[in-house]
Amino acid sequence: MRFMFLNHSYVRHSAGLERHILELLKSYAAPDTTFELAYPEDLGGGEVLSLLEERKALSGLHHILETPALVKKTIEAERRGFDAVIQSNTFDPGVEASRLAVRIPVIGLLRASLHFAATICDHVGLIVPLETHMPHTMRLVRTYGMDRFVSGIRTVGLYDTGDLSGYHDVVVQRTLAVGKELVAQGAEAIIPLGGKIYPYVVTPQELEPELGVPVINTKAVGVSYAELMARNNIKHSIKAYPCPTGLDPEAVSQRSKHAH
């Protein structure tokens, strides 16, 4: 099986981080599964992303503006013969729109992780990097019909655009603090969001012993869902995601020929 692991942004990771990501993905996957890390073009959302990152005010606006570029890249993935696209970002940017454009599976880590968690507990707590992530995240949860399942959401108040490896200890400390609050309020499992932090800097295995509940690895869930769908030739419901055939990737970003 061959999967595209699609970054939400056109900004490339360092070579070292790319190697680390591929090693992690392969550790979650079957021996015959391969991955290609891919990046969308910047079709206009890049400047907004830079501004929101600079102000540490990631609200979801950048994900909305990234959607056309992500749809375009997903169409390219289908044309190139990939078995599925896994969106690397844990807030599912472009996933719903992309499912309307292709028939290969497009996996959103948040939605997949919520439903996976629902098979092992009755109430889950969410952890996000910044306070500004909270409204957008809960909006997504409500859209997915999972709001009654989420018992609470907390933030670690931490985000950086560069290498986060130096933040390991403070991330663990803050995650355990808010995780314990969520468990005290009734969470029976925890989903930490913000893939650049979890599991790239801190792994769920580091958190579970202290929290005493399952900590969901969103990347591992995404890989397993993609394998399940590809191996069994399962596709998104055509009733839920009506999809025209033969969409040209360039049609997503070109100006209308009828524009004046």
Residues of each region from the PLM?
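Short, glycine-/small-residue-rich phosphate/pyrophosphate-handling segment
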Residues: 118-155, 165, 170, 227-260
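Active-site rim beta-loop-alpha module in soluble metabolic enzymes
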Residues: 141-195, 201-202
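Gly/Ser/Thr-rich loops at beta-strand to alpha-helix junctions
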Residues: 9-12, 87-94, 129-133, 193-199
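Short, acidic/small-residue loops that bind anionic groups at enzyme active sites
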Residues: 97-120, 205-225
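Periplasmic-binding protein-like
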Residues: 79-89, 186-195
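Glycine-rich, highly charged phosphate/nucleotide-binding loops
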Residues: 56-76, 170-177
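N-terminal glycine-rich anion-binding loop in soluble enzyme alpha/beta folds
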Residues: 1-64, 129-167
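C-terminal alpha-helical cap/extension of soluble enzyme domains
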Residues: 6-12, 27-32, 36-55, 60, ...
